[in-house]
Amino acid sequence: MNRYQTMFKSLNQNKLGAFVPFITIGDPDPTTFIHIIDTLIQSGADALELGIPFSDPVSDGPSIQKSMERSFKSGANISSCLQLIKKIRNKYPTLPIGLLIYANLIFKNGIKNFYAHCSTLSIDSILIPDLPIEESSLFYNSAMYYQIAHIFICPTNASLDLIKKITDKGIGYIYLLSRSGITGINNTEFNKIKLNTLIYNIKQCNQKLPILQGFGIYSSEQARSSLLSGTSGIISGSCIANIIEENHPNIDLLLEKIRKFTHLMKIAMKL
């Protein structure tokens, strides 16, 4: 049983959903980043989704773009990011750790070489936001070879045919988009009818594959609504990026706000 399976099984038995924070690796600097990770985990985060900064993050809104800029300014590159993941893995051996990375960064390092390196770090999943399923075979095959879950994204306009393809190949979980566009906080209401239909169709195709909803989830009310709609939990990143932006370099205040945000999300994850 892998780490995701163990996590979801334990949460299901306790009637809980998963709170998975997203954070750009090295934001705002390597030392503070590790303090933030420790605070998230100690406050109850069930898994981590960690992003490697990229110069043209087409799927990410202003908050995550700024977090990537801060990471770059602190000297982040792929090598330093993977070293930070190694630290986290050594400290938290049973925690599911997912990686979000844009396709070009993997190409530059060589697909097989990159997945081989990730395997040595015990990375559990890799999500590539700019990679359509039709072009994913080389990445997917390397992921399968090294026993890393290739996470597929289910967009809001997914056809039943696309959902079948995703659920047939999906491992770990499915990333369900709350809405189209880019990540970030805005006042656009989620189309609950459309989301409920997507969740129903996913479960009709594969009842065993967990669904995590992301994109624009910034409140405990949204998180709660997602769970009650039938997902297995949520991924939230822009709120954390905003907390870092608004409170750094006041580390104590920054960590306290991270702690409070995580606590609220964990309360929302109780069925």
From Swiss-Prot:
The gene is trpA. It catalyses: (1S,2R)-1-C-(indol-3-yl)glycerol 3-phosphate + L-serine = D-glyceraldehyde 3-phosphate + L-tryptophan + H2O. SUPFAM superfamilies: Ribulose-phoshate binding barrel (SSF51366). Keywords: Amino-acid biosynthesis, Aromatic amino acid biosynthesis, Lyase, Tryptophan biosynthesis. It comes from Blochmanniella floridana. It is an enzyme of class 4 (lyase). The alpha subunit is responsible for the aldol cleavage of indoleglycerol phosphate to indole and glyceraldehyde 3-phosphate. GO terms for molecular function: tryptophan synthase activity. InterPro entries: Aldolase_TIM, RibuloseP-bd_barrel, Trp_synthase_alpha_AS, Trp_synthase_suA. The lineage of its organism: Bacteria, Pseudomonadati, Pseudomonadota, Gammaproteobacteria, Enterobacterales. Pathway: Amino-acid biosynthesis; L-tryptophan biosynthesis; L-tryptophan from chorismate: step 5/5. This is Tryptophan synthase alpha chain.
